[in-house]
């Protein structure tokens, strides 16, 4: 049975006492890179993707971050007392995974009101140390991703032409 080893408040700069509101606003996906002993936290709505390195004592230290967009979501939350998701908020991360060498994040880009139709979603690849490496365009119906250990292929769960779930595979070019 696991035990909590450390609690890190990723968004301590926001004075949100209601834990359910904080969860709604700052939920996301987590991926771990074994080789680098690094975690990537990619939030669903907030703009800052954070990378944490595991220390020798088992604690976690933030080592890098990458900002998607302008940070307008965080600015609005800082200035607001309502702490609600709005129809024009953008969903950033849908899914995240890692391979031996990289982290991958499935970027959505749709607003919560679904007022914009998207032509693509994007798989964003970061090095195991949190540096942006490349971006792949994918079908807008992709919902989940996983990548082969050697980064040669991406596997996806997507919505098929008749509305059914379908599994897809695409080869990735290795640089």
For each of these PLM feature ranges, what is it?
Residues 85-126:
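Loop/turn-rich, solvent-exposed surfaces of beta-rich toroidal or solenoidal domains
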Residues 45-48, 110-113, 160-164:
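Short glycine/acidic-enriched loop and turn motifs that connect beta-strands
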Residues 3-25, 59-88, 140:
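Surface-exposed loop and turn segments in beta-propeller and other repeat-based domains
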Residues 1-2, 118-131, 169-174:
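Beta-propeller blade signature
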């Amino acid at each position: 049975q696991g035990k909590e080893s450390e609690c890190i408040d990723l968004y301590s700069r926001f004075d949100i006492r209601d834990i359910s509101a904080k969860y709604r606003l700052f939920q996301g996906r987590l991926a771990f890179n074994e080789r680098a002993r690094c975690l990537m936290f990619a939030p669903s709505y907030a703009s800052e993707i954070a990378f944490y390195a595991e220390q020798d004592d088992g604690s976690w230290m933030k080592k890098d971050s990458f900002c998607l967009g302008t940070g307008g979501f965080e600015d609005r939350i800082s200035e607001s007392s309502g702490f609600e998701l709005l129809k024009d908020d953008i969903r950033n991360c849908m899914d995240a995974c890692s391979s031996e060498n990289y982290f991958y994040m499935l970027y959505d880009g749709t607003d919560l009101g679904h007022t914009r139709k998207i032509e693509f979603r994007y798989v964003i690849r970061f090095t195991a140390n949190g540096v942006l490496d490349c971006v792949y365009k994918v079908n807008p119906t992709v919902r989940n991703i996983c990548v082969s250990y050697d980064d040669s292929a991406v596997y996806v769960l997507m919505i098929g032409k008749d509305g059914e779930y379908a599994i897809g595979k695409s080869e990735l070019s290795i640089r």
